[in-house]
Amino acid sequence: MASVDFKTYVGQACRAAEEFVNVYYSTMDKRRRLLSRLYMGTATLVWNGNAVSGQESLSEFFEMLPSSEFQINVVDCQPVHDEATPSQTTVLVVICGTVKFEGNKQRDFNQNFILTAQASPSNTVWKIASDCFRFQDWAC
């Protein structure tokens, strides 16, 4: 990344992250059966220390989760430097918020995504390469 273009990369990352967050959590709460389509075929999800890989396994995992209501409080994003992911446009997205799963109390969570740009004939589609979800328990 040339330093002169860095603001452009940051702007693209922020727009991609904002759009992604809206799509991801809306899909998680309302159309979960479609959620695995947002992941690359080789993507890995680590959910509170438990790893799930591949779209079929991801679909099965998401279908097992109770209904949810996510509230996003913080979104941070940044482009990943070209040296870390050569020839691949990549964005790191960090989310903090609260979630209420049916039958459970509301909890704080943190979720980190690594998104990669997948070119299609009409536009760029961002796919999840890596996803790490953690419940956050506050120390007293």
From Swiss-Prot:
Gene Ontology CC entries for this record: cytoplasm; nuclear pore central transport channel; nuclear speck
Subcellular location: Nucleus; Nucleus speckle; Cytoplasm
Secretion signal, residue range per the UniProt entry: none
Gene Ontology annotations of biological process type: poly(A)+ mRNA export from nucleus; protein transport
Bilayer-spanning residue ranges: none
Keywords from the UniProt entry: Acetylation, Cytoplasm, mRNA transport, Nucleus, Protein transport, Transport
Domain NTF2 intervals: 16-135
Assembly behavior: Heterodimer with NXF1. Forms a complex with RANGAP1, RANBP2/NUP358 and NXF1. Interacts (via NTF2 domain) with NXF1. Stabilizes the NTF2 domain of NXF1 by heterodimerization. The formation of NXF1-NXT1 heterodimers is required for the NXF1-mediated nuclear mRNA export. Preferentially binds Ran-GTP. Associates with NXF2, NXF3 and NXF5. Does not bind nucleoporins (NPC) directly, its association to NPC is mediated by NXF1.
Protein name per Swiss-Prot or TrEMBL: NTF2-related export protein 1
